[in-house]
Design a protein with these regions (language model features):
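Bacterial Sec-exported substrate-binding components of ABC uptake systems
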Residues: 1-45, 158-198, 313-331
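Structured C-terminal subdomain patch of bacterial secreted/periplasmic proteins
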Residues: 146-156, 230-231, 252-331
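Short helix-initiation/N-cap motifs at beta->coil->alpha
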Residues: 21-23, 79-90, 111, 231-239
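Extracytoplasmic ligand-binding site segments that recognize negatively charged/polar headgroups
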Residues: 64-66, 107-115, 125-158, 191-214
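Solvent-exposed loop/turn segments at secondary-structure junctions
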Residues: 41-44, 61-64, 100-101, 106-110, ...
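Proline-aspartate-enriched helix->loop->beta-strand connector
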Residues: 89-103, 240-256
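A short, structured surface patch at a secondary-structure boundary
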Residues: 39, 43-96, 100-101, 105-109, ...
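Alpha-helical, coiled-coil/dimerization segments enriched in small aliphatic residues
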Residues: 208-235
């Protein structure tokens, strides 16, 4: 990732940095002090690089503070200015007077609420878009234009430059890469198990993640194959009938308010399309916290946790890999 610093005066003040975000070169403050962050995965990015005290508002983190505290500590998480449990409005963002807004399409930005990068830029606020949520075309609602690990590395590098924590960001990226290499060196199954991510669902469809979402690379890093690897999107809805064709060996749940693990299991066991799937019949389920599934530094913790679970279910050989952090959830 190439960053270009400038000491010339601009709308951002005397010091700016030019970064590439969603394929576009844009100027940002090089030492942003007031960052409005939406969603727990992006809060995790900021905390991981030591920029927590530069968060002026944090929204959309209701129900995820315990998961964040397990990794970043209760003191750091309790100090977050939790403005609201819900996603922000344009008025709320403007009222916080941020230098930078950190959000994504489907993660706070949306045309229906008029909270868009374009609207913020028109009002003098630098708008950063979560790379996982980048759109291939401005009028295309499908998200995802790059490999999820590449998206995460890009965001950490960019946010390091914008907040003045470049070295810290490099250390986080290096640590993730080291742990990924350890997972890649682990012994593999002769036939890799198929894993399905279930965020939520009803009798007709499941909200899940395609090949541009974090679960794709998490599942792959753990030594398995994603049941939705052929879906060209990040987070999206597909039919249970399509899922049933993949015959998943293990089902992983995204622990997220609105539908408990028990409710998801009951749905799977009652649905004719899923009740006889290997994962359901053998009750091979793994429940992991939301910030570890969505694009964040915790993705590697999710991969280590899933690897351990696959070994427990005898889906892959023993490796000796242990999760560094506990990102499981009771549900």
């Amino acid at each position: 990732m190439t960053h270009t610093s400038s000491s010339t005066s601009s709308a951002f003040g005397p010091s700016t940095v030019t970064i590439t975000n969603c394929g576009a070169r844009r100027a940002f403050p090089s030492h942003a002090r007031r960052v409005f962050v939406n969603d727990s995965n992006m809060v995790a990015m900021m905390l991981s690089i030591g920029a927590g005290d530069q968060i002026v508002a944090a929204t959309g983190i209701k129900g995820q503070t315990d998961a964040l505290a397990k990794v970043y500590g209760h003191r750091a998480v309790s100090a977050l200015p939790d403005s609201d449990g819900s996603y922000p409005t344009l008025e709320q963002v403007l009222g916080a007077r941020p230098d930078v807004m950190l959000a994504g399409y489907g993660y706070g930005y949306g045309e229906s609420t008029h909270l868009t990068p374009e609207e913020l830029r028109a009002r003098g606020i630098s708008a950063y878009v979560l790379s996982e949520s980048c759109r291939a075309k401005s009028d295309d609602k499908a998200r995802g234009v790059m490999d999820p690990w590449t998206a995460l590395r890009s965001d950490l590098s960019n946010l390091g430059a914008v907040t003045g924590h470049t070295q810290e960001a490099r250390k986080v990226v290096k640590d993730i890469d080291t742990r990924r290499r350890a997972l890649a060196r682990a012994p593999q199954a002769s036939t890799k198990p198929t894993v399905l991510m279930v965020d939520s669902g009803d009798t007709g469809s499941v909200f899940t993640s395609g090949r541009y979402g974090g679960p794709e690379v998490i599942i792959k890093a753990a030594g398995a194959v994603s049941a939705t690897t052929d879906v060209a999107n990040t987070w999206t809805t597909i039919s249970w009938e399509k899922i049933a064709q993949t015959r998943p060996d293990v089902i992983v749940f995204n622990d997220y308010p609105g539908q408990t693990k028990a409710q998801k299991v009951a749905l799977l066991e009652a649905n004719p399309a899923t009740k006889n799937l290997p994962a359901v019949k053998n009750r091979r389920f793994v429940n992991i916290a939301y910030p570890a599934w969505t694009s964040s530094p915790l993705n590697v913790d999710a991969a280590e946790t899933l690897r351990q679970s696959l070994e427990k279910y005898r889906m892959v050989p023993a490796s000796g890999i242990k999760p560094r952090h506990d990102v499981t959830a009771r549900g």
